[in-house]
Amino acid sequence: MVDNPFGAPVGDLIRELRHQRDLTQVSLAERLAEVSGNDGVNRRQVARWERGKRIPSRYWRNWIAVVLEIPGPRLDRAAAVAQFLRSASEAADDVEVGAR
C-alpha cells in the first residue's frame, strides 16, 4: 500500500475489505453481479481495480459499498486518492522525460 496523508487508494481499500470478509476476487465479482443485476463485472475487473489499473466508476463503487458494507463516501474518497496519485505519477513521468 502507498503511504500518503490522504488514505488508501480505492484498489488497496477494496482488497483489504475483501480479505477481511474472506471473499475471493471471483466471489466478490459474483456478489456484485448478483446485487446489481449487471453481469458486466468479473474477476479480471476486480483484479484491475485492486491493482490500480482501473478506478471503479461511481456505479460500481455504489455496489461495492453495498457488498463490502462500507459507506459510499469512503469509497469515493479512496477513488479520489487513486486518481490524484495516478495524476501525480503521470506528471512526474512527464517531468522525468522532459529532463532527459
How would you name each of these model-derived features?
Residues H19-Q20, G37, I55, V66:
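Short N-terminal micro-motifs specific to bacterial/archaeal maturation
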Residues A33-P56:
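Recognition helix of helix-turn-helix/homeodomain-like DNA-binding domains
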Residues V10, P56-S57:
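Residue-level preference for nonpolar/small residues embedded in alpha-helices
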